[in-house]
Amino acid sequence: MKKILLTSLMGFLAWGTQAQEDLSQYVDPMIGTAKMGHTYPGATVPFGSVQLSPDTDTIPYEVNGRYNPEVYRYCAGYQYDDATIVGFSHTHFSGTGHSDLGDFLMMPTSGPLQLNPGTEADPDSGYRSRFSHDREHAAPAYYQVTLDDYDIDVELTATTRVGVHRYTFAQGEDAHVILDLMAGIYNYDDKNVWTFMREENDTLVTGFRETTGWARTRKVFFALSFDKPIKQYGNRKYDEKQAYRGFWGRFNESENFPEIAGRKIRAYFDFDLEDGEQLIAKMAISPVSTAGAIKNMQAETPGWDFDAIHQAGVDSWNKELHKVQVKTIQESDKVNFYTAMYHAFLGPTVYGDVDGRYRGLDMNIHQAEGFTNYTSFSLWDTYRALHPLFNVLQPARNRDMVKSMLAHYDQSVHPMLPIWSHYANENWCMIGYHSASVIADAVVKETVTADLAHALDAAVTTAQTAYFDGIGAYMEKGYVPEDVSGASVSKTLEYAYDDWAIAQMADKIGNASISREFAARAENYKNVYDQQTGFMRPKLKDGSWKQGFDPLDTHGQGFIEGNAWNYSLYVPHAPQEMINMMGGDHRFVEHLDSLFSMDLPDRYFANTEDISREGIIGNYVHGNEPSHHVVYLYNWTDQAWKSHDKIRMILRAMYQTGADGLGGNDDFGQMSAWYLFSALGFYPVAPGSVEYALGSPLVEEATLNLENGKTFTVEAQNQSEKNQYVSKVLLNGEELHEPFIRHADIMKGGKLTFIMKGRPNKKIFSKD
C-alpha cells in the first residue's frame, strides 16, 4: 500500500510539472456499488477489455428450478454491503440490469487448501475471505483490499487487455492461487459449455472458457503468467457426468498434469514464498486464441513493474478526464462529476487483440481494418445520452463504435444492426433498433462522414425486419398490438423515434425517398394515444384499446421500465406535436408538474425488478431511462423556467457521493451521461437532431477540451446552491432567445454563459 501511495504522489507531481491537475483523485469507483447502481469498484482503463474487480458472491441464477431474484443484485459481481470476497474476476459489466461475464476468477489463499468457495453465511466452509471496507481502497486503474482470513494484501491494476495482480502474503508458507473456471456472474446450471487449461511451463498457464446464457456462444481465451515459478499445481473437476474418459484414465490428471479439460474445473497453483513476500500475476484475455492472449500480454505488459503499469493506467484516465475541467459549487460536486465521467468512459469496451483480430458475430475471426472493434452495446440505454456525449468528447471512439456496429450488421445472418450485443453475440435484450439512432446522430453531427450509404442501408434493413419483436405488425398497422407482442406501447413509441432518426440520416445523405418513408413512420406514436384518457395505452390487433388500463402501473400495461404517466411523454422527435396532441401548453405543463409532485405508491412497481424507490421523484422515474429527456420538455412550452429547479433537484437526489449514491442502474454510463450533460447545462433530447435543449447548469465553470483542438466553455455567473434558476443565456456574448444550442456551436469552440438567480425569470425564452 505504501508503494501505491508513493507512486500516486509521484504521478501527481509528474502531472503537476505539466500544469495538469490529477483529476483521477476526484473519482470514487465505490459510487454505485450498493443497492441498484450495479457498478464495480475494480481496476480498469478507459474502454478497457479487462475489468479486474472483486466478486463478493457468485450465487446461482436458479434455486430449485426457479429464478433466484437475489442474483439481480450481483450484475456487477460486487455488493458493497457484503462481508466476504470470493475472488477477483477479469470481466464485468458496469451498471447493467442483466448480466454475464465474471471470467477467470482468481483468489490467493494460504494455509490448508480449499477449492469450494463456501458461503457468506459460513465463510470458513470455502476459500472466500472476510474483508473490511476500512482496509479496502478503489481508484482509477487500482483496487486494493486485505483478505482478513489469510492476511493477504491484494492489489489490482490493468491495461486494456491485461489484468495485473500483486499479492503480499504475510505468511508465505502454504501460499496458493486458485483459478476458478466455474465461477461467473449470473450462474446458470449449465452455463459452462467447456473449459480448457494447460501449463505451458512453470510460470505460464493458458486456456479458454466457453459459456452459454445471455450470450449464447461466448468464448474467451487467457494467458496467465506469474513472476515466480509454480511449485506444484492441480485441479478438481466437478462435472456431474463425463461424456468420454477413454485412455485418459492412465493419468492422474488432478495433480501436476499439464492439461485439463471439462465443464467445471477449479485449479490451484502453489508457491514457495517467504513471509511478507510478494507474488505478481498477469492475466491477459483474448477473443481469438491463447496465442492472441500471449501477444496482448507481451505488447501491453512486457515487464513486471506493477507500479509503472498502475501509473500508466492513472495517466490514461487523467488524459480522458482532462477533456472537461470544471469548477464546482462544492467539492462533492467535483467528485460526482469526475466519477460520472469515469463511469461514462468504461464502455463500450475494446473487443479485439493488439493486432486488430477479433471474433465476429459469425464466430469467425476478422481483422479490424482501420478501426478498433468494440463490444457491449447496451443500446436501449446508451443511445439517449452516452453516445451523444461521445460525439462531443469522444468522436474518434464513437466513429469506431459505429464501424463496429456496421461490422456486426455485415456478419449478421438476419441481417440486423446490434440490439444489445456483447462478446460476438446478439442477446436481443430490450426493445427498439437504437443502433439506428446512434448511427444517425453520428452522421448528422458529422462524426461519421464515410460509408454513409452502407450505414443507411443497415439501418433501413434492420427497421424492416418483420419477424423481429412486432415490427411486421408495426409496419402493417402503424402500431405494435399488445396481443401480438408485449410492451407494445413502448415498442411503438421507440420504433417511431428510431424511424425519425433514420429519416434524419437519409435527409443528411440526400436520399429523399427513404427520408419521406421513415418520416411518415415516425408519426406512428399518434396511433397509441388515447384522447379520452390522455395517455398512450396498449391497443389490440383488432384496433380496440386493451381493457384494465392503469396509467400508474409499471407492470402488464404495455410499457417497459415505466408507466403511462412517464412513457406518454416519449415523443422526443416531435415534442411540439405531442404537446398539441395532449391538449396544448397549459394541459401539458399540468401533466409535467403533476409527474414530479404526485405520489407513486410501491405497489405500482412491486412486480418490476428494474424499478426501485431510490430512483423515483414523485411519479418521475429517473432511475430508468425512458424518462431521461422529460424534464427538458418544458422548453417546448411557454414555461421553460420550470425545468431549472427540477434539474437541480434530480442532480441532487439521484447522484450523491457514497456507495449508494446512484438512484438506479448506471446502465453502462447512461445515468452518468445524463448527469454530465445536465451539470453542463444542456441535453440531447432527440439524438439525431443537431440541437441540445438548455437547462440549468450545476457547474460554476467548465472547459471542454475538444478533439479538434477547440475549447468550449460553460460559465454560470452567480452560481450557488440557492441560485438554481437561469435568468439569461448568452452564446459568445449574444443573448439567446430560444432554449437551444446547436452541435456546431460547441464543436467550433466558444462560450456559453448562464446568468443564475435565486428566483425564476418567468419570461425567459417566452414565446410572446
Which functions belong to the PLM regions below?
Residues 725:
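Extracellular attachment/recognition segments
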Residues 1-21:
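Bacterial Sec-dependent N-terminal signal peptides
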Residues 20-387, 391-437, 441-493, 501, ...:
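Accessory carbohydrate-recognition regions in carbohydrate-active enzymes
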